[in-house]
Amino acid sequence: MFRLAAVASVCLASALVAPAALAQTAEPHRTVLKTADLTGTDKEIIIALLEVPPGAFIARHTHPGEEAVYVLEGARLQMPDGKEIDRPPGQAGVNVRDVPHAGYKVVGDKTLKLLTVHIVDKGKPMTVPAP
């Protein structure tokens, strides 16, 4: 009887802890592929892969320079106004210096994968939080 109670306690504890362990917050992950100084300027170029898994949120932000974006693998996004849009593979865009953008969450079951190219002021943070 004691053994059965002990096993039941372990099973109950596992059932209560497992969902919390699985409910970890999804986070975007940026892998810098190449960084180089631009000739004759105080700017640098940063080429990166940005992976945004389902449930992850990209806060509104700016850059101290330009950012070109190419969608490698698309996903569905929930915009700040609650509207959902598709970001298909092959789509490209440019975000200009100091203009806030993003503020979206990836919804559905696909990870958004972006190739980004930044030409930014050398030595400054690549991303600056925006209001």
Predicted regions, residues:
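Short acidic-glycine-tyrosine-enriched beta hairpin
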Residues: V52-P53, A75, D81-V99
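Short, conserved beta-strand element in jelly-roll/cupin
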Residues: E51-V52, P64-Q78
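A short, N-terminal "cap"/entry segment at the start of jelly-roll beta-barrel domains
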Residues: F2-V10, S14-A15, P19-I46, G93-V96, ...
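Extracellular/periplasmic catalytic domains that process cell-envelope and extracellular macromolecules
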Residues: T41-D42, T62-H63, D86, V106-T111
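Ligand-binding loop in jelly-roll beta-barrel domains
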Residues: V99-G123
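Extracytoplasmic low-complexity repetitive segments enriched in small/polar residues
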Residues: T35, P54, R76-L77, A92, ...
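A short beta-loop-beta micro-motif enriched in histidine and acidic residues
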Residues: D42-K43, A56-Y70
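Short beta-strand His + acidic residue motifs that chelate non-heme Fe in jelly-roll/DSBH
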Residues: R60, Q78-M79, N95, H101-G108
